[in-house]
Amino acid sequence: MKRLTTLLILLITISFLGACSTNSSDKEKENQLIIGIDDAFAPMGFRDEDNEIVGFDIDLAKAVIEEMGKEAVFQPIDWGSKETELQSGRIDLIWNGYTVTEERKEKVLFTEPYLANSQVVAILKDSDIKSLSDLAGKSLGLQAQSSASNALNSSDIASEIKDVTEFKTNVLALQDLENGRVDAVVIDEVVIDYYMTIKPDTYKVLDESLAPELYAVGVKKDNNELLEEVQKAMDEVIANGTAAEISEKWFGENKILN
C-alpha cells in the first residue's frame, strides 16, 4: 500500500511539473514575435563572422519589439516565400528591407515606411556600361521575388535586355557579376552601398536609378491589432531618437523617415 501511495505521489508530481513547464513555455511563446528575414541581405539583416544575425533592421526590430514589451526572434526564411510564411502563421512579421508595392498590399498590411531606398544598377568598376541605355543586349542578375524585378520590368530598358538571371540572394548575384556571368545586377541601393565600402575597387553604380521605393514592416492581412502595436512602438523609437542612433551606426547618417 505504501509503495502504491508513493507511486501515485510521484506520478502526480511529474504531471504537475510537466504542466508547469508547458505553461511556462506557452507564456514564453506568447511574449515572442517571430520575424521573417533574409539572412544574406547586408546591411539590413545578415550573418557576421561569428554567424550571428546582425544588421540595421535587426537592431531596429529589437528596439521596437522591446518597446512593445516583447522579445524579437529572428527566423531566416526563403525570401521568395515570405508572404506564404506570414499567411501560414509561421512568422508574425516580415522585416528586412521589405519594399512597399501595390501587389504586396493585396497580401499583407504595412506599417508606415521608415526608410527610403532605390533600385539601382551595379556594375564592375572597369565596365564599359555608362548608362541605362547601355544595358541593351546585356545579361542582368537580380534577387528572385524581390522588388528589383518589378523595377526592371517597369523600366523603359526592360524589352532590350538580353536575359535576366534570378538568384536566391544578392550575394550570389554579385558573385556572378564578379565572375563575368552577368554584366550588371539590379539591387537595392542600401545593399550595394554596403558592399562598395567592403570592396571599393570592385563595384560602382550607374547614376540613373530604376525606381525609388520605401521600406516598411509587413503584418498578416487580418491582424490590425498587431499592426497598430508595431506602429505605435515604431513611432516611439523614432521619436526618442533610438532609430536615428541605429541608422548612424549602420549608415553613418540618419536615414530614418519622420
Predicted regions and their residues:
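Extracytoplasmic small-molecule ligand-binding "clamshell" domains
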Residues: 26-97
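Extended ligand-binding regions for polar small-molecule ligands
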Residues: 58-67, 126, 133-134, 139, ...
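Periplasmic-binding protein-like
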Residues: 39, 116-123, 189, 193-234, ...
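Ligand-binding cleft/hinge of the Venus flytrap
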Residues: 45-49, 61-69, 148-167, 196-200
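C-terminal motif of bacterial Sec signal peptides marking the signal peptidase cleavage site
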Residues: 16-19
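Acidic, polar ligand-binding/catalytic clefts
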Residues: 62, 71-134, 204, 209
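A ligand-binding cleft/hinge motif common to bilobed small-molecule-binding domains
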Residues: 98-106, 151-154, 176-179, 183-212
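Ligand-binding clefts/hinges and TM-proximal coupling segments of bilobed small-molecule sensing domains
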Residues: 22-25, 147-165, 204-207, 234-258
